[in-house]
Amino acid sequence: MAELKNDRYLRALLKQPVDVTPVWMMRQAGRYLPEYKEVRAQAGDFMSLCRNAELACEVTLQPLRRYDLDAAILFSDILTVPDAMGLGLYFEAGEGPRFERPTDTIDAIKKLCIPDPEDELGYVMRAVSTIRRELNGSVPLIGFSGSPWTLATYMVEGGSSKTFEKIKRMAYAEPAALHMLLDKLADSVVLYLNAQVANGVQSLMIFDSWGGALSHHAYREFSLRYMQKIVDGLTRFADGRKVPVTLFTKGGGLWLESMAETGCDALGLDWTVDIGDARRRVGHKVALQGNMDPSMLYATPERIHQEVDQILASYGEGTGHVFNLGHGIHQHVDPEHAGAFINSVHELSGKYHK
């Protein structure tokens, strides 16, 4: 593998000195870019794009050609794991992801098999190795998975949900069934992420998109417990370097201290958390990623510049900060505004790293 030329992102996650604050964007390869839309149309549908290693590589690299980003993130989807378990993933116009065979009974859960990442998910591994080769050491490659709780919400609900009624009914009326599902998912995610590392990813992120829907105690029982199991099972060294792990619970500001106890290297923050306060709470244990409101990218470049300056000032001096949005970039954002955001981070952050 080519030697890494820009390791700013990895260094910040490990709280090592950097010259400027590194920056990347969740969903940086996506629908806000006209060049992405062209490749998406060529692929035919979203999962066909994910399953084609060359096209997945192309859309992963597109934002790096436009912007001075400090990391690439594998183009894929969190629902690849349940899809590989045989649930029949499809996307319905205006409705988002759906499953033909939801896992909403104990019998359905018992029948689930843990997928082989080099077989049922081999297309993801081919994409990883292709992207890593094409990056040629320019920036690190981030791999990822959904958290067991978040994957389970889609599997039990049969798709997206605003109320999470079915999975919460299972959590409180049939907790043993849900724990069986979460356990299988945690085992699957460990294998999946370790295979990503073996094929070339240099950092890992676990997206707990729906952890914030849980009550204070239920979060620990049904979400954090299984992210802990994953962290404990991950390959943490490859290519002679540590492979940093970031946990991100959207709406998880209540639980930063508990999340930091898992042994992860960094926590992602959504935009509802003050990053300076988060640093005071857990900055002695973990690095922090975030956390500008993605909707701020609809503002003028001047206003974006001000917001970046405010977040950098709130975090303060020193390393341990990876700048990002507090969630994925919106599809209708002007690409020029995304560029203004990235340039502002590099331009304004140097003074915090003297």
From Swiss-Prot:
Q: Which reaction does it catalyse?
A: uroporphyrinogen III + 4 H(+) = coproporphyrinogen III + 4 CO2
Cite the EC number: 4.1.1.37
Q: What domain of life is recorded for the organism?
A: Bacteria
Q: What is its main location?
A: cytoplasm
One example of the protein's molecular function in GO is: uroporphyrinogen decarboxylase activity
The family classification in the record reads: Belongs to the uroporphyrinogen decarboxylase family.
Protein name in the entry? Uroporphyrinogen decarboxylase
Q: Which organism is it from?
A: Shewanella frigidimarina (strain NCIMB 400)
Question: Highest lineage ranks of the organism?
Answer: Bacteria, Pseudomonadati, Pseudomonadota, Gammaproteobacteria, Alteromonadales
- The gene behind this protein is hemE
